[in-house]
Amino acid sequence: MGKNAIVGQSGGPTSVINASLAGVFESCKSRGADIVYGMCNGVAGLLEERVVDLSTVLTDDLDIELLKRTPSSFLGSCRYKLPDWHEDEAVYKKLFAILEKLNIGYFFYIGGNDSMDTIGKLADYGARIDSDIRFMGVPKTIDNDLMVTDHTPGYGSAAKYIGVVMKEIIRDATVYGTKYVTVVEIMGRNAGWLTAAAALAKSDDCEGVDMICLPEVPFNVDHFVEKVRVMQEKKPSIVIAVSEGVKLEDGRYVCELADDVHAVDAFGHKALTGTARFLANVVARNLDTKTRCI
């Protein structure tokens, strides 16, 4: 390689994000990188020059194998939104000065869509100033919603977890003979892959969830209530998996019907909360049944 490499982790952790980190470290070292740095808390930490020589903490094969099986993000994470360079070029100048100081030739960033936004901005700015640093995004997201990526590391583990938990919820919901509707809210702003994984609960010993509501399909509250009513004519206990990001035909999030959503994160995304609670309350008001939201 001739130059050093640096790698960071960003966004929410997954069960396998550290396996990707181990892969980057091993690949860079095997291809001649003198030093492979790790950013402590992603780009936010890099701006403060908080980096670590990974060879000092990954000293042998056992360390690397343990890292692959270590949960959460080994290097720490951040949700730092990198501004556009023409709005705040000083941030870019500082970052590239730090990278030059560390003799970086290869920059890896492990994360989801927002992290790919960061790596894209850095690559564009690097091209603008004729930098020879190579910027590479390493896919990571439990949502499985990265463009041109069939399945992202992290989704499989999350999907398996959801399938297991939903089966346990179904078992719990059927212990009483009374009418009961359980609405389970699952992550997924615009992509329904995680919610769809609730279907994995179905097996020879479990009939599975009764309804799955995805953000890709326009949601109608009245139709939803009617479907629940019809289902309860056949069985008392109903379990529903609903994505946090289900939307009405006019584009509004269902959770906005309950309360105005004002809070946003660093990337400007609305804070989605209360979808299951809202739908459980609607069912309770319109049907003679107990409800709960999870």
What is the role of each PLM region?
Residues 10-12, 39-45, 79-80, 112-113, ...:
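Short, ordered loop/turn segments at secondary-structure junctions
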Residues 36, 72-75, 135-137, 183, ...:
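Conserved beta-strand scaffold positions in the cores of enzyme catalytic domains, especially
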